[in-house]
Amino acid sequence: MASSMRSLFSDHGRYFEAFRRFLNNSTEYQCMREFMDKQLPGIIARIGGSKSEIKVLSIGGGAGEMDLHILSKVKAQYPGVHIINEVVEPSAEQITKYKELVAKTSNLENIKFAWHKETSSEYQNRVMEQKEIQKWDFIHMIQMLYYVDDIPATLKFFHSLLATNAKILIILVSGKSGWLKFWKKYRSRLPQNDLCQYVTSFDIIQMLDSLGIKYQCYDLLSTMDITDCFIDGNENGELLWDFLTETCNFLTTAPPDLRAEIMKDLQGPEFIVRKEGKILFDNSLSFITIEA
């Protein structure tokens, strides 16, 4: 690997911009919203029971777009019930954006928000020091298990926080997506980092089976439009390359042979489909629900 290549995570500003471009060029959030609209009401149908208050815990809530969509479903399912929504998010920038989104969003009455600037591991350590451990009715972990050191321990811990009839929702890339094939083939030749694990739903399901935890898994097709990646000098394409490879300035720092090989692969049927003149990378998602 060329010494000039460095992990995208080493430049937080560029990482968040690349992530924003990914969201703008993929059906990721559209796919999540479809799941929330069609499946979530059934999943949360029993979490409230006759309670006067429902406690929701968001691990890795980011800027809050999906959190608020989830809360709208909880609120619709349990009209008039008070909702406590606590958010664990390590990025101060994301928390600021989340608070700004809440401030300009209507219909959030009866919802009390609290934010904690910490990682899930830091949250776990803090909770374990408390004499009385808070139980939760609904915990969701959206695209964040990649950033956990010990995933089985994390799953076991959050499962232990579930109240009666409570659920956990985990969202991450499907083992059937193009990501698994891409990571298997290229991760050893791309910059290594200590922040991210290359896991898919296949890994999480295996861990849950080993832990004896009951779950259900749903897969939904999502795509990422990478057409701009093959237009010379296209800034959007350059940032999408960075996101795909998790490499800062991939096009200008990658060895020519590696760059050519990846560019060829990402135009082939193993990773993409062509539709209406667009090149679409398979970004399929898995939605895993865990019972108390």
Curated annotation (Swiss-Prot):
Which parts of the sequence bind S-adenosyl-L-methionine? 60, 89, 94, 120, 142
Q: Which domain of life does the protein's organism represent? A: Eukaryota
On whether Translocase is a keyword of this UniProt record, the answer is no
Task: List, alphabetically, the PROSITE patterns matched.
Answer: SAM_HNMT
Q: Which Gene3D superfamilies match?
A: Vaccinia Virus protein VP39 (3.40.50.150)
Tissues expressing this chain? Expressed in jejunum, brain > lung, spleen, stomach > liver, kidney.
Q: Which UniProt keywords apply?
A: Cytoplasm, Methyltransferase, S-adenosyl-L-methionine, Transferase
What is annotated about its quaternary structure and interactions? Monomer.
Protein name (Swiss-Prot/TrEMBL): Histamine N-methyltransferase
Tell me which species this is from: Cavia porcellus
Protein's gene: HNMT
